[in-house]
Amino acid sequence: MKVWAYVIAWNEELMLPYYLRHYSTFCDKIIVYDNMSTDSTRMIAESYGDLVEVVPFDSGEEFNDYVHIELKRNSLKNAKGNADFVILCDCDEFVFHKDIRSFLNDNKDCSVFYPAGFQMISDDFPKDLEGQLYDYVQWGEPSPWYTKPMIINLNVIDDVNWVEGAHELDPNLNLGSFWHPVPEDIRPIGEYKEHVWGKWQKMWEILDTFNSKPLKMLHYKYLGADYVSNRYKLYA
């Protein structure tokens, strides 16, 4: 079984070391789409040798969701026949399981995996530390918005189509069996309690169950005021 990870990076010299340290523990290959970074992002990625491939692209110094979605779809095409599972995420998104390779093998009939999302928070960014980021930042809150389609099983499904923002897939897709922290029989499609996006409202009601889910996504965005403000300035 082969697991590949794809990540889009733009001046990620602070976060990328933690990202690579985590995903290199279970991925057979990591592809970094580098958006013409002007810091040490590329050098950090290349320090991992053959495990990491750097693919440059240029969005014209702007955050462009449509470019990112196209990169994701091309990633699936490129990985087909080479990888069994593909993880598609941002640099601050850490798919976590105590034994993820065994988990994927045990659920190899699932087409798409939606890890239970958590918004992780700390007072400051943990700079220049050894070990995993989740060894230092362990507090967060469940987040249905970050319960995203992040792992694709290429042995079951060939292509998927994200909606803008890549937090959800085209609702017209037939995914067959897929893994989601909210049981399918209580995950409504359409309006629910006057909320147009019914399933998001339902997830808010059962957030207390998220911590018991074996597959999680730890989103490390709010790691101190300085780190957050600098990221927003980059995207402005």
Model region roles, listed by residue range:
Residues 2-3, 27, 83, 110:
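Local beta-strand N-terminus motif with an aromatic residue
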Residues 90-94:
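The conserved acidic donor/metal-binding loop of glycosyltransferases
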Residues 18, 46-89:
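Active-site-proximal specificity loops/subdomain of glycosyltransferases
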Residues 17-18, 43, 98-102:
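Generic recognition of short, well-ordered alpha-helical segments
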Residues 22-61:
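Acidic donor-binding segment of Leloir-type glycosyltransferases
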Residues 2-21, 36:
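Active-site beta-to-alpha loop of glycosyltransferases that engages the nucleotide-sugar donor
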Residues 65-76, 96-236:
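Catalytic-site signature of metal-activated, phosphate-bearing donor transferases
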